[in-house]
Each structure stands twice: as C-alpha cells, then as structure tokens.
Amino acid sequence: MKRLFKKSLLVSLLLVGQGFFQSAVGQEPAKPSLEARFRQDTNQVEPSYQENLSSLVSYMKGKGFDIDSLIADERFKIDDSIVIRFKNSSEKRAKDLDEYKRIHEYEKKKIAILEFMEKNLSQLRRAEETYGIPKETIAAIFGIESNFARGSGRFNPFNAYVSMHVKGIRSDLAIPQLIELLKFCRKNSINVFDLRSSYAGAISYAQFLPSSLNKWFIGNDLYSMDDNITSVANYLSHFRKIGGSLERAVYRYNPKGFYVRFVMDLAKEAEKTLAGSQ
C-alpha cells in the first residue's frame, strides 16, 4: 500500500511540475480546436438541437451565409432562457388591458413620456412634420419598446434567432430574420456579436427586427436617438398609408391588441397633458 501511495504521489508531482514548467516558459496547455470545442458545447444540449443546428448551418450555406465560424465562436450559445421568456411574455400573462398596463408600468410612463418628449422635442417635431406621425405616438412607441431608450436588450440577436430555431420557437420568424440580420451586418461591416437585442431579436431603442432595419431604418447609427425617432416615424408613415389609419400602423409594429391600446392611450395622455400646459 505504501509503495502504491508513493507511486501515485510521484505521478502527481511530475504532472504538477510539467504544468509549472509550461507556465514558466510562457506556454499554456494546448486548447481544444474550435471543432472539438463545438462538439463539447453541443454535447451539452439535446440531440434534437444538434440535428436542428446542423440543418440550419446547411440551409444558411445555401443562402450564401457560412455560419460555421459564428457557431464555433465562444460568444455563441443556445439560450435556454428564451423559451421561458416567450412563455411568460406580457401578452400571455395579462388577462386584460388593465393588467397589461400594470405590467408595463403605464402610470410611470405617463410622466416619463413627457420627460422624453422634452428631451427630444426638436427631432420629434421634425419627424412629425416630415412623416405626418404625431410626436406623441412616436414617443409612446419608445416608451413600451425600450422604456424611452433606457435599454435595448441584453441578448445577442444571432444567439436569439438560432436558439429560437433549434428549440422550435417561432421558427417561421427566426430563419428569415436571421438571414436579414446577417445581411444587415454584412452591409454595414458589423460583427454580429457586438449587437444587443431583446430575447425575440429586436434591436436598438426602436426595437426593430432585422427585416425592418434593412427596410425602414434611416441613418448610420443604430444607437442615435435622432435616427431611431426618424426611423419609427418612417415605418409608421408607410403602414398608415397601407392600412388607412394610425392605429393599424401601430398594429403592424406589434400585432397585439393590448400593445396597440397601450400605445394609443399613452399618446393620448401625453397630448392631453401638453395641450393643457399651453
């Protein structure tokens, strides 16, 4: 037993010594290749996810996008929390409009919208004059989408759309938006992992989906408040012409009844308050 113990101790000392020597000469133990690390990572998810991931890589290659290097990037991950977020969205939790308003802090936003409008009044007025969209409605959109530009999401849109696809959540949306996202990044020379989004992949203060960024975003800076305000007005103007009303344009922004009522009511409150203060 003593001899066995001494042998084990000697092996351990040799291994420690080897690690010390490598550190001393500035060498680190060899890291696994990207392919090997990818296998390790994907082994942590269900086999069905690996299948979906492989089919997605093949599909995207056919569309002209080689996403192998993105999948192998250490910043890539399949985000399990996205499933929970979709299941617990405010639209699913709210039983009526009053509850929806409580979830989105309507009473606080009645005050915050006035502060936002005062801070961005010149650009809101320009957008209203150019596109014919009331400045209060534009401001209300920012209120519900990004709490008046206080946040733009903590997720990565590439991870979000890939996660949605492999987990079977709104796959009909995920793949087209993933393609639009990669088009946007290619066109603007942006590293996709530098972007932040909501859990549903909506980007910046206006919370545009990638397809909307490509069609309706005006300007060069995703995080310019002026560019975001102009782009929201541009979007609403287009869809008001198609739908025939401002309410229908807001519905195109988010096709949920509670969302539309929240935006329209908040805009009306702001308009009434501003009219009374003049």
Residue ranges and their predicted role:
Residues 1-172, 180-190, 195, 211-278:
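Cell-wall glycan-active module
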Residues 197-208:
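Extracytoplasmic ligand-binding site segments that recognize negatively charged/polar headgroups
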Residues 177:
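A contiguous pocket-lining binding segment that forms or flanks enzyme active sites
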